[in-house]
Amino acid sequence: FDPQCHEPTGHSDKNPTSYDQRWIHIKRPAVIVGGEMELSSVEINHNPTTNLCEAPMQLKANCGIFVVDDFGRQRIKPEDLLNRWILPLEKRIDFLTLPNGIKVQVPFDELVIFCTNIDPKNLLDEAFLRRIPYKIRVYDPSPEQFKQIMTFLAPKYGIEWDDSMMTYLLERHFEGKRPMRCCHPRDILDQVVNAAAYRRTRPVLTREFIDLACMCYF
């Protein structure tokens, strides 16, 4: 159990003697790793000071989702990770080595998602790509989708929505200048909030704040 990855359900058995009390009933986990991932992250890590072992990330994600974000930009090479995971991805089992050298078999029962903005053909060869059978391309949003994302996020930032400012944003900073990305609404709103905090004022969608946000961001 790792409180950073696992959320207890609060479920309590009427007969506590029916299972080992060291087990905790949790919701399906969703574990996300990014550029900090190393080859040691997928192995058991032993702390010599506390003499405790920490489970690897993929074991913590069992029965849930394991997301490798920014795949290809980790400290570990993509081919090294796939070499390590060829058996787990195919057989849904993994073999981990304990500090005493004994290997133990554990389940690899999770949905593994690799996210990247690099062409997969530039990351891995054909043999490795076959181990990842489904590839889903996420296209750039349309102006209407871009607006929907902004409309959804603005209240979360405490910003009142203004349709006229959305039109200004698209015409001034996107049309004929750059493609729209799904991350742009969040990042632009972040810039607006930061600019307002610096000026000690309430964040609002104005031409001045939009221009300042885009100037800093792009």
Annotate each PLM feature.
Residues F1-F114, R178:
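Conserved ASCE/P-loop NTPase catalytic core
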Residues C63, E90, D94, P133, ...:
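Non-catalytic alpha-helical coupling and interface elements of nucleotide-dependent molecular machines
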Residues V67, G72-Q74, P120, Y134, ...:
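Residues immediately C-terminal
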Residues G72-Q74, V104-Q105, L111-V112, I118-N122, ...:
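Conserved nucleotide-binding/hydrolysis micro-motifs of P-loop NTPases
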Residues P78-L81, P120, L124, F128:
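Helical "lid/switch" subdomain of P-loop NTPase nucleotide-binding domains
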Residues F108, R131-I132:
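Short, structured coil segments at secondary-structure junctions
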Residues K121-D125, V138-R186, Y198-P203:
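Conserved C-terminal "switch" segment of AAA+ ATPases
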Residues C182-L189, A196-F218:
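Conserved C-terminal helix/linker of AAA+ ATPases
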